[in-house]
Regions:
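Active-site rim beta-loop-alpha module in soluble metabolic enzymes
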Residues: 178-182
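Conserved small/polar residues in nucleotide/adenosyl-binding loops
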Residues: 184-190
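Short, solvent-exposed aromatic-acidic interface loops
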Residues: 173-175
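Interfacial segments of multi-pass membrane proteins
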Residues: 155-159
């Protein structure tokens, strides 16, 4: 949560605020310092999403009621959308970009369907579910989009092998500079 807060300070306070102020933009040294601070904040914050994906998979595996889990995530996605749009896009509602909880919800629903089709021994249906979930995230313009859904599904597929989760997660999110660091905790021995 702390890394997410750090990321949001960069996105909202710096990118949507300070870096747009004319007086700051006209002072090259100050602008460069604030822009570099923003970059650092955003790099630190990029660790958050992969951790949330891992925790979503763990929650899915351990919850007693997956439907209630999905419903709560859906409600939280809805409640979070207006503050997200105000903070990131500067308007009450913006259909162009949806918050990260919609990505997590799509990933959760995909896990539910893949699990159902796994029990029915229908691997083709599982692949189709993953593809459709990725397309849905892309079409809805969710935060992290299809890549986020893919990451969730990879963590779910390799749920019984931490090292494979680490490798799959780091490779899937290698385009995010600091995101692979998110998986180092998975390599630590458990007691």
């Amino acid at each position: 949560m702390i890394t997410m807060l750090i990321d949001h300070i960069g996105a909202c306070v710096f990118e949507r605020g300070l870096l747009l102020v004319d007086e700051i933009r006209n002072d090259a040294a100050l602008f460069e310092m604030l822009r570099n601070t923003d970059r650092i904040l955003r790099l630190i914050g990029r660790v958050s999403f992969p951790i949330f994906c891992f925790l979503l998979v763990e929650g899915f595996l351990h919850t007693h009621d997956r439907k209630k889990y999905a419903l709560r995530l859906f409600l939280f996605a809805l409640v979070s959308e207006i503050p997200f749009d105000l903070a990131i896009m500067g308007r009450l509602f913006d259909p162009v970009h949806q918050n990260v909880f919609f990505t997590l919800l799509i990933g959760l629903l995909a896990m539910m369907l893949c699990d159902y089709f796994r029990m029915q021994a229908q691997p083709v249906a599982q692949v189709l579910v993953l593809i459709l979930a990725m397309v849905l995230a892309w079409a809805l313009h969710t935060d992290y989009g299809y890549r986020g859904v893919l990451l969730i599904e990879l963590l779910y597929i390799f749920r019984y092998d931490r090292m494979k989760q680490v490798v799959a997660g780091a490779v899937a999110f290698s385009w995010e500079t600091t995101a692979p660091v998110s998986y180092t905790h998975l390599t630590l021995p458990t007691t």
